[in-house]
């Protein structure tokens, strides 16, 4: 039945998101996140030069998992597009999908809220758009020390 199918999808999404929280310990977080997304039936297409710094990759990986889960759950999508842009002082990451356009403004639930907290604790910024289509934008500082400067005061 439809209810059973939706329950299975939620169970898969929760499992993928739980395992994505363990990604930071993985040797290659972006590849691990890509595999988690594929388990949900979402292909991840990356464009641009992915950051080399492991701590930045470990911050991006949960965003990929969260966006893949939301792509399936809310947009009935099958592809997640990840665009990397290296700037002198930061790495920008834009995530969009091929799913349905959100019907209303996106309200951050548990997954996006937790992601925002992780990004901001690292000194980064996160923006979410619902129009003209879903887009998650991350801006992560190039220097890890810059993310923790305010802690020293």
Question: What spans do the regions from the language model cover?
Answer:
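DHp/HisKA dimerization-phosphotransfer hairpin of two-component histidine kinases
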Residues: 1-43, 85
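Short C-terminal beta-strand
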Residues: 134-144
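ATP phosphate-binding glycine-rich loop and adjacent ATP-lid/helix-beta elements
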Residues: 104-132
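Conserved DxG motif in ATP/Mg2+-binding regions
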Residues: 91-99
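Conserved short strand/loop->alpha-helix "switch" segment adjacent to the catalytic nucleotide/phosphoryl-transfer site
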Residues: 40-65, 106
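C-terminal end segment of the histidine kinase catalytic
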Residues: 143-153
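Histidine-centered phosphotransfer motif of kinases
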Residues: 1, 54-78
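Short beta-strand/loop element within the Bergerat-fold HATPase_c
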Residues: 79-89
